[in-house]
From Swiss-Prot:
Oligomer and partners: Homotetramer.
Gene designation per UniProt: nanA
Main location: cytoplasm
Name of this protein: N-acetylneuraminate lyase
Keywords: Carbohydrate metabolism, Cytoplasm, Lyase, Schiff base
Amino acid sequence: MATNLRGVMAALLTPFDQQQALDKASLRRLVQFNIQQGIDGLYVGGSTGEAFVQSLSEREQVLEIVAEEAKGQIKLIAHVGCVSTAESQQLAASAKRYGFDAVSAVTPFYYPFSFEEHCDHYRAIIDSADGLPMVVYNIPALSGVKLTLDQINTLVTLPGVGALKQTSGDLYQMEQIRREHPDLVLYNGYDEIFASGLLAGADGGIGSTYNIMGWRYQGIVKALKEGDIQTAQKLQTECNKVIDLLIKTGVFRGLKTVLHYMDVVSVPLCRKPFGPVDEKYLPELKALAQQLMQERG
């Protein structure tokens, strides 16, 4: 049931080695690190996971390893979106086979597909997922697909759709979606507005920075449930100070560097054409890693 998918879900990074190959050992450590820090689930193979610079077989390997390592301890959502419907269907079938709890797909991008073509794309993936709920992934800043509110309302009511990952800064639209669909599982996508997203109606979030400080986001959820707005705001501010630094360094490579200093990821590199972190930021990232490890205890 999609209702079981509510919570704080880390958008999992994909570690690579010096030769740009998948680093399976680091991936396993990262899964365990997230489990140990109290994350509710993992969103695997999305933007943060650098899915679009991986081959289809690599993406399937990542799904298999994560499913094997998580062993039913947390919820697992497989992002299977590709421009190609057939490739998306192949990944969806793999997610079902590996025991994932849901699939997700970004709107098909690059080509100017019609909205009906978008709907057909999702219907085909849902069919291949064989009963797994679909999490529609709306991220207009990266996909270039700017869905209207009416189009979002149509997509989330397709048979088989159980959730929406709303990676948009439009909190008014977030509230409108919640008002229209009170039972929809709704994820906030931008980490820097997590608390605001919850207040606008989100059930939880899917975010990249949860990989290094997921307990802070769980703290925001707890504070808001208790009506403690001041604590929620304080925690969001602390998260945003980290995000300010990561925006300067490049978010994915910055996160991997922090995780490297935490002894979770062996090599802090993203796949090319992404480059490495500028060395001038390394002292700040190392200090951040030490701070977070002390805070976590």
